[in-house]
Amino acid sequence: MSELDTARTGAVRKAADLLYEATRSGVAVVPVRNLIGETDLEAAYAVQEVNTQRALVAGRRLVGRKIGLTSVAVQKQLGVEQPDYGMLFADMARTEGEEIALDDVLQPKVEAEIAFVLGRDLDGDQLTVADLFRAIEFAVPAIEIVGSRITNWDIRITDTIADNASSGLYVLGSTPKRLCDFDSRQAGMVMERQGIPVSSGVGAACLGAPLNAVLWLARVMARAGRPLRTGDTVLSGALGPMVPVAGGDVFDVRIAGLGSVTAAFAKA
C-alpha cells in the first residue's frame, strides 16, 4: 500500500470513528470532509461501510436502503449529478402509533416519501424497469426522519454519504398498494404539521419518478456485490422539501392513490 493509500485509509477510519462517537454521544461533530475531502465519494462510502460493519457486528439487522439527493436542485447545490444511498436497519423503524423521542435523531427533519418493499431479489448487472415491476411486492407512504451527525447540517456530498446518507428513523404507512393500483410518478403529496400544510410535491420530483431512483439503487447495489433482496424496504427519496421538527409536532402525509402516514414526536 502506498503512502497516499495509507493516509487515505487512516482518514477514512478517523471519519468513521468521529461519526460513530457522534451517534453514541448524541453530540454533533465537525464536517468529515475536513478528513476525506469534498469530492472523494469512494472514501465517503468507505466511511459508511466501516460503520455499517460495526452495526452488523453489534447485531443490528439490515432491512433495506434509503435513497437521498433525488432532487435535481439539491444535486446542483451539492455539485453532484447522482443520488446517494444509506443503509436501513430494523431498529430505525417506528410505527404510526409510537411517539418518537426528539433526541432519537440528531437535528431531525422529516421528508415524505414512497417506500417500496421487494418480493424478489434484484440482482444481475442489466436490471430494467420491468425487473422492478416483477420484484416490487407493494408500496406504502412513508415519513423519513432524517438527521445529521454534522453540526448545523453543514454538509457537502461526502459528509452526507459518510453519515449513512443523513439517515435517522422512518415510519411506514399501513395501506400497502400494488404498483398497478396507483401512479407513483403522478402521485401528489401533501404534508401537514398540526393540520397546517408545510410541504408538498409530486412523484416526478423524485429523480423524475420514484421507480427511477429505485432502479438506480438496484443497479448500484448489484454492481457493489450487495444486491437488494426479498423483503428489503427501499425509501425512494423525498417528494417535497424537508421540514424541521420540534417537540410535540405531529406530521400527517397524504399521497394520492397510496394513502396516508403519521409521525408524532414527544414534547421536548
Swiss-Prot record:
Role summary: Converts the product of 2-hydroxy-6-oxo-2,4-heptadienoate hydrolase.
UniProt keyword list: Aromatic hydrocarbons catabolism, Lyase
Pfam families to which the protein is assigned, alphabetical: FAA_hydrolase
Top-level taxon of origin: Bacteria
Cellular component per GO, a single term: cytoplasm
Sequence similarity: Belongs to the hydratase/decarboxylase family.
Protein name: TodF product hydratase
Molecular function via GO: 2-oxopent-4-enoate hydratase activity
Enzyme Commission (EC) number: 4.2.-.-
Pathway in which this enzyme or protein is active: Xenobiotic degradation; toluene degradation
Record carries keyword Lyase: yes
Gene Ontology biological-process entries: toluene catabolic process
PANTHER family: 2-KETO-4-PENTENOATE HYDRATASE, ACID HYDRATASE
